[in-house]
Amino acid sequence: MTTLEVVVVLITGDSAAAHSFGGFEFRSLAVPSRGSAEIAVWTVDVPEGGDGTPHRASKEEVFYVLSGSVTIQGQTASAGDAIVVPPNTELALTGGPARVLVATSVGIQGTLADGQTITPPWSL
């Protein structure tokens, strides 16, 4: 019988890299630069009256509201709710104040309304 060594990575919230974009604050949790190989997870703090940049994400995204409430495509989610957004669906995160946990696949890219494609730095 072969025994495989399993390596578990602890990523503390205090050590998460912080990024700002459009008045929103992102904190990278489980992303490739922190040890994740397939899944990317971060938090986003949405300010009161937050009006996110419209974009399309190349991968499915799951938004889990930790506190407050946000709206995506007319769907308002409060603490404990989740919104699943299929890939290539136009969306903008609005509302707040709120803290949201976002989960997606590694390699996600966003296409902005002007056609510019970006790789969100909080996903790396």
What are these regions (language model features)?
Residues 27-28, 39-57:
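Conserved short histidine dyad/triad with adjacent acidic residue
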Residues 55-81:
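A short beta-strand-loop-beta hairpin characteristic of the jelly-roll/cupin
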Residues 25, 37-42, 59-61, 66-68:
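A generic structural signal for short beta-strands and their flanking turns/coil linkers
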Residues 34-38, 46-50, 69-71, 106-109:
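Short, charged/polar surface micro-motifs in flexible loops or helix N-caps
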Residues 35, 76-79, 87-115:
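Ligand-binding loop in jelly-roll beta-barrel domains
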Residues 1-38, 115-124:
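A short, N-terminal "cap"/entry segment at the start of jelly-roll beta-barrel domains
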